[in-house]
């Protein structure tokens, strides 16, 4: 019997363990009986683990240096109407007094 290829990384080196298929290359586990769930939905969590969504308001929880500027974003700065994007800095927003910015979700908390 031939084992199925990994649905995540397409590796041929998979093995079966207790009814689950496991890929040693990407550590993906799946059951052939249930359909593979692929979600295009972007999941972003704040510093406290709360799910963030487009349009949310957040507060900065740490003083952040702004690259290319001598000023800083102070703790407690409120940011309204965020937009979630792919990438390392996964929050796109406009901050009063600074203009457009990209922030990391680990430095904000949901209001």
Curated annotation (Swiss-Prot):
Q: What happens when the gene is disrupted?
A: No effect on phosphonate metabolism in B strains.
Gene symbol?
Answer: yjdM
SUPFAM superfamilies, alphabetized: Prokaryotic SH3-related domain (SSF82057), Zinc beta-ribbon (SSF57783)
The name of this protein is Protein YjdM
Assigned GO CC terms: cytosol
Output the Pfam families linked to this UniProt entry.
YjdM (PF03831), Zn_Ribbon_YjdM (PF08274)
User: What superkingdom heads the lineage?
Assistant: Bacteria
The organism named in the record is Escherichia coli (strain K12)
Gene3D superfamilies attached to this UniProt entry:
2.20.25.10, SH3 Domains (2.30.30.40)
Family named by the database record: Belongs to the YjdM family.
């Amino acid at each position: 019997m031939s084992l199925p290829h990994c649905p995540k990384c397409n590796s041929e080196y998979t093995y079966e363990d207790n009814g689950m298929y496991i890929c040693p290359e990407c550590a993906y586990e799946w059951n052939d009986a249930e359909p593979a769930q692929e979600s295009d939905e972007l999941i972003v969590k704040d510093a406290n683990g709360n799910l963030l969504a487009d349009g949310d308001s957040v507060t900065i929880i740490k003083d952040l240096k702004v690259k290319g500027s001598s000023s800083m974003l102070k703790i407690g700065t409120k940011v309204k109407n965020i937009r979630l994007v792919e990438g390392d800095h996964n929050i796109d927003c406009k901050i009063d007094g600074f203009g457009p910015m990209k922030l990391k979700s680990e430095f904000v908390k949901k209001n």
